[in-house]
């Protein structure tokens, strides 16, 4: 990508060699430190739920049909690959997370290579460090997978145009298709990038049909593969029903206001490098160049994806953060070959990223208390005492992500039903979709009554802890009180350090089915 005038590319700039030594050295040191400080992070947050879905699939359950869960088939496929190729525990998951970061950096370097690899390295390093500073609950997130797949797609897109390779357009489409099978908003990226490809081909007076056909075929491959898998499993109808029903209902819950989402969509963590980079974008008029337009379009699509998802979670910004970090790297490194105050702006931005943002992010990543596994340890001890392996198929969790299913995963216990979340069962305002979910769960519960129920105090999308959720469904409350006995209630003694600010630990109640 030519982020600056090619006529200035060979100009000798005072201090450039020093910056080329200091910036990558500090970035690399911060990356290595962060990797060393986070390599022992366990599988926590959303990842255990998806690990458990893969575990259930391996034990004969079919997604959407037997496992009522709202994630996309591509997510399960990548999660399955990580578990089976790298290992089922925390070590394998860290390797997968590091691998995603390495792939993101490689794609960024490929995109900036024609001018200077350092721009891609700068962007990739900052993106990785921002990801690490978000903490252990953000490892391997679906938006991270989508962001990395889109970065790789863009790298092949630029290669296809630069080298005039039709087959590379097919590879672009392939990775864009994978992104779309991970998160529905991946379709936005694919569509916008295809439009930019068409416009660039028209500008270069190249035949558009071969490139567009190749990219469309590439995009279709992972989409069709997922469809064929669902058809083979007899789950295509169930998938459509879940997406139209409970997934859409999930999207309506816990939504901040639109102004809050719009403000929150900008990754303020990157301000120290974004301000000088965006100044250069205007001063150097690099926004006119096609490669920069690709990055800007992906930034806009990333913000759009964040707003559409409507939860305000930090990891929903990953696609936007990835491309913004890349753009900053390309513009700041390119700006080093400018003159006067523009070069000063570029140097300031590069040093701010390398000397402040990178090491501070690594230090924040170090500060998480990842050792806390008290919930799992306590629940494992209780379930072992109640039968251990004999509880296979006879235990049911009521949670959203409070570590109950993570415990079952580590104990290799299959749940009694395929219903993963209690979030939709106990909403204060029920809808036809959630009432249908209740009805189906009720039927599954009575088809295979669990011997043990684990009820957590987690209330989805809220920080408060609440054991009174069952009271919102009187029929279930009566069933719980008449058919089960409260055997134990446990609260871990220490706060959870998985987030920037320690949180109240999750508690659980253990109910045992009464003997007839």
Annotate each PLM feature:
Residues 167-184, 189-196, 221, 299-308:
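Membrane-interface alpha helices of multi-pass inner-membrane proteins
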Residues 187, 373-431, 435-465, 491-495, ...:
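Short periplasmic/luminal acceptor-recognition loop of GT-C membrane glycosyltransferases, typified by
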Residues 95-118, 152:
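Transmembrane-helix motifs of polytopic, lipid-linked glycan transferases
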Residues 188, 309-343:
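Hydrophobic/aromatic-rich transmembrane helices and adjacent perimembrane loops
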Residues 108-130, 147-148, 161-167, 293:
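Transmembrane-helix signature of polytopic, membrane-embedded enzymes
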Residues 73, 77, 86-103:
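Loop-to-helix entry region of an early transmembrane alpha helix in multi-pass inner-membrane enzymes
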Residues 113-114, 118, 153-171, 203, ...:
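Membrane-interface transmembrane helices that cradle and orient dolichyl/undecaprenyl
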Residues 2-7, 11, 189-220, 281-286, ...:
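Perimembrane helix-loop-helix junctions
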């Amino acid at each position: 990508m030519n982020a600056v005038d090619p006529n200035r590319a060979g100009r000798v700039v005072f201090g450039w060699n020093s910056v080329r030594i200091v910036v990558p050295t500090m970035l690399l040191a911060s990356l290595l430190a962060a990797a060393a400080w986070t390599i022992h992070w366990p599988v926590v947050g959303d990842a255990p739920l998806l690990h458990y879905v893969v575990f259930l699939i391996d034990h004969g359950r079919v997604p959407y049909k037997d496992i009522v869960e709202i994630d996309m088939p591509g997510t399960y496929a990548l999660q399955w690959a990580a578990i089976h190729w790298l290992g089922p525990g925390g070590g394998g998951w860290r390797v997968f997370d590091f691998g995603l970061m390495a792939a993101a950096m490689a794609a960024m370097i490929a995109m900036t290579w024609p001018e200077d690899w350092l721009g891609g390295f700068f962007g990739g390093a900052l993106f990785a460090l921002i990801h690490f500073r978000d903490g252990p609950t953000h490892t391997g997130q679906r938006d991270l997978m989508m962001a990395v797949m889109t970065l790789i797609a863009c790298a092949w897109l630029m290669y296809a145009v630069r080298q005039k390779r039709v087959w590379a357009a097919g590879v672009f489409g392939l990775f864009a298709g994978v992104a779309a099978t991970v998160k529905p908003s991946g379709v936005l990226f694919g569509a916008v990038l295809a439009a930019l490809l068409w416009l660039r081909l028209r500008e270069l007076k190249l035949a558009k049909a071969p490139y567009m056909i190749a990219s469309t075929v590439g995009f279709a491959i992972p989409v069709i593969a997922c469809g064929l898998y669902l058809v083979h499993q007899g789950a295509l109808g169930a998938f459509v029903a879940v997406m139209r029903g409970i997934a859409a209902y999930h999207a309506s819950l816990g939504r901040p206001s639109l102004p809050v989402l719009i403000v929150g969509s900008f990754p303020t963590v990157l301000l120290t490098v974004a301000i000088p980079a965006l100044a250069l974008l205007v001063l150097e008029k690099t926004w006119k160049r096609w490669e920069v337009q690709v990055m800007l379009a992906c930034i806009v699509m990333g913000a759009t994806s964040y707003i559409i998802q409507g939860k305000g979670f930090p990891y929903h910004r990953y696609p936007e953060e990835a491309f913004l970090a890349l753009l900053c790297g390309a513009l700041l490194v390119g700006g080093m070959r400018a003159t006067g105050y523009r070069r000063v702006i570029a140097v300031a931005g590069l040093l701010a990223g390398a000397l402040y943002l990178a090491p501070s992010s690594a230090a924040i990543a170090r500060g998480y208390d990842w050792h806390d596994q008290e919930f799992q340890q306590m629940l494992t001890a209780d379930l072992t005492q109640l039968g251990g392996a004999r509880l296979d198929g006879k235990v049911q969790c009521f949670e959203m992500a409070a570590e109950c299913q993570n415990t079952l995963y580590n104990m290799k216990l299959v749940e009694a039903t395929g219903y993963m979340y209690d979030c939709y069962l106990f909403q204060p305002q029920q809808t036809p979709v959630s009432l249908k979910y209740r009805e189906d769960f009720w039927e599954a519960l009575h088809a295979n009554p669990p011997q043990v129920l684990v009820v957590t105090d987690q209330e989805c999308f809220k920080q408060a802890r609440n054991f009174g959720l069952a009271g919102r469904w009187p029929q279930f409350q009566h069933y719980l009180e008449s058919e089960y006995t409260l055997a134990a209630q446990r609260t871990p003694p220490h706060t959870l350090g998985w987030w920037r600010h320690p949180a109240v630990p999750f508690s659980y109640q253990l109910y045992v089915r009464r003997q007839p």
